[in-house]
Amino acid sequence: FHGEITSEKVAIGHIFDGSATLVVGTHTHIPTNDGRVLNKGTGYLTDAGMCGDYDSVIGMNTQNSINKFFKKDSLKHFPSEGEASLCGVIVEANPKNGLANKIDSFIYGGELKNIS
């Protein structure tokens, strides 16, 4: 499913609650801090984030992206070359029913840091 906005992703989580181990969004590239196990046992996170350089525009070259906003001459999008972050989710599932017991997100390297 394609979920552009957070409310669509939350709705998808509830649709699959109890039927899937995990529902995770990815489209916005920015990690959210709302990981939880839903009422019927599905792990949920609105957005896991991206694997890429956060000192950029969603992983792409910053100046080229800004030029596109102002319709200035720009090259095709190309990846930023800064230090990358690896963002993701770890889910602990019940081996008997396949549903989530616990969900944790992580951020490793780069500009972003986990907030305790």
Predicted regions and their residues:
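Active-site rim beta-loop-alpha module in soluble metabolic enzymes
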Residues: 2-3
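Conserved beta-sheet core of the metallophosphoesterase superfamily
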Residues: 6-79
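A short C-terminal boundary segment appended to hydrolase-like catalytic domains
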Residues: 65-116
